[in-house]
């Protein structure tokens, strides 16, 4: 009988070679996630730069949206496809453009290109954080936190227009274009009175407050026993001891508020929880808007305001303002619908 001594090694395959090359130590880590991230990010950014530089929105929105037409950084945009395109993916080789690149740009194909590559690019970036965290034995909280902006992007740019009649009703990729979309959301959905929007605002602004308080508190309680010229040179990045005094910080905030965090883990988890929860709530709210779910309606106030000219609240004024936004934007944004509003549905009262 023959006894083989040693460890059995499986035969290496092309997958092992690819894994070695993709995950080797280099200045910019590639990894398996990079196969998704880098091409998608390149195409999304390249498509946006191309669109804002050269491509008009005359055929989709009746607007000038490129630097070539006289726009600047704040007014240029890659606009959504025409309303008649519905939810078509608008491939260059598809039945709409039929391989004609110019026609594809005129129909709004660049928007679909940027939106889809952008979504997969963001997902690739989250996978990159998972992959690197696994490689260096970190927990995956960075990737989990980044799921929040991904949820917002996907809900606003993809799910909302999927619930409506077409990509036309998604935001265009531009600064002023996003502002107009926000006004649209307010006028047609009363978004500011939606509880999910309120939770989102509380999460984002609460996170900003927590960030400012945390940074100031750490700066306030830094140990000074270093020989460096300033705060940033006083400590070695590989030091074993603490940089700041948690005990002093706890004492300070206990005196200010009467309560304070005494545990660093809970403190930092709370700083993660607040913005991530807020953004996720916003994303859920936008999914609701895709289904045309309504915000709060205080009908009793509306009825009383309609019957009593001396009764008005900030709510009833905002409702009138929303009616004005709808009456103005619908005819402007959708001239092809030939919308005609009878007098009784046009804004009334003194809100405008």
Curated annotation (Swiss-Prot):
Q: What is its EC number?
A: 1.10.3.9
Enzyme class per UniProt:
oxidoreductase
Q: Where on this chain does Fe cation bind? A: 214, 268
Q: How does it sit in the membrane?
A: Multi-pass membrane protein
| Residues reported in the UniProt entry to bind chlorophyll a PD2 | 197
Which of this chain's residues are annotated to bind a plastoquinone? 214, 261
Q: Where in the cell is it found?
A: Plastid, Chloroplast thylakoid membrane
Q: Where is the signal peptide?
A: none
Instruction: Locate the transmembrane regions by residue number.
Output: 40-60, 124-140, 152-165, 207-227, 278-294
How this chain assembles, per its entry, is:
PSII is composed of 1 copy each of membrane proteins PsbA, PsbB, PsbC, PsbD, PsbE, PsbF, PsbH, PsbI, PsbJ, PsbK, PsbL, PsbM, PsbT, PsbX, PsbY, PsbZ, Psb30/Ycf12, at least 3 peripheral proteins of the oxygen-evolving complex and a large number of cofactors. It forms dimeric complexes.
Any extra detail in the entry? 2 of the reaction center chlorophylls (ChlD1 and ChlD2) are entirely coordinated by water.
The record's function comment reads: Photosystem II (PSII) is a light-driven water:plastoquinone oxidoreductase that uses light energy to abstract electrons from H(2)O, generating O(2) and a proton gradient subsequently used for ATP formation. It consists of a core antenna complex that captures photons, and an electron transfer chain that converts photonic excitation into a charge separation. The D1/D2 (PsbA/PsbD) reaction center heterodimer binds P680, the primary electron donor of PSII as well as several subsequent electron acceptors. D2 is needed for assembly of a stable PSII complex.
Full protein name? Photosystem II D2 protein
**Primary gene name:** psbD
């Amino acid at each position: 009988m023959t006894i083989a001594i040693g460890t059995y090694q499986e035969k290496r395959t092309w997958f092992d070679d690819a894994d070695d090359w993709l995950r080797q130590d280099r200045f910019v880590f590639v990894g398996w996630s990079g196969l998704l991230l880098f091409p998608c990010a390149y195409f999304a950014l390249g498509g946006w730069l191309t669109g804002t530089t050269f491509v008009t929105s005359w055929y989709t929105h009746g607007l000038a949206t490129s630097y070539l037409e006289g726009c600047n950084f704040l007014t240029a945009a890659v606009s959504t496809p025409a309303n008649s395109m519905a939810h078509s993916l608008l491939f260059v080789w598809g039945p709409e453009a039929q391989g004609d690149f110019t026609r594809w740009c005129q129909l709004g194909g660049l928007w679909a290109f940027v939106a889809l590559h952008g979504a997969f690019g963001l997902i690739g970036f989250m996978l990159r954080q998972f992959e690197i965290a696994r490689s260096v034995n970190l927990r995956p909280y960075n990737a989990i936190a980044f799921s929040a902006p991904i949820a917002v992007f996907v809900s606003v740019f993809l799910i909302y227009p999927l619930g409506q009649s077409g990509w036309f009703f998604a935001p265009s990729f531009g600064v002023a274009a996003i502002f107009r979309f926000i006004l649209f959301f307010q006028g047609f959905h009363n978004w500011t009175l939606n509880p999910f929007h309120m939770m989102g605002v509380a999460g984002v602004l609460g996170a900003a407050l927590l960030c400012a308080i945390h940074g100031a508190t750490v700066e306030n309680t830094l140990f000074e026993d270093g020989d460096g010229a300033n705060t940033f040179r006083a400590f070695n990045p590989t030091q074993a001891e603490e940089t700041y005094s948690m005990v002093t910080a706890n004492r300070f905030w206990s005196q200010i508020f009467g309560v304070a965090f005494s545990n660093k883990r809970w403190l930092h988890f709370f700083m993660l929880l607040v913005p991530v929860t807020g953004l996720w709530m916003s994303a859920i709210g936008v999914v609701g808007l895709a289904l045309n779910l309504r915000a709060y309606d205080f009908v009793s106030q509306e009825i009383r305001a309609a019957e009593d000219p001396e009764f008005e609240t900030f709510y009833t004024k905002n409702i009138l303002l929303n009616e004005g936004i709808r009456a103005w934007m619908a005819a402007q944004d959708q001239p092809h619908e030939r919308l005609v509003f009878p007098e009784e549905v046009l804004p009334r009262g003194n809100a405008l």
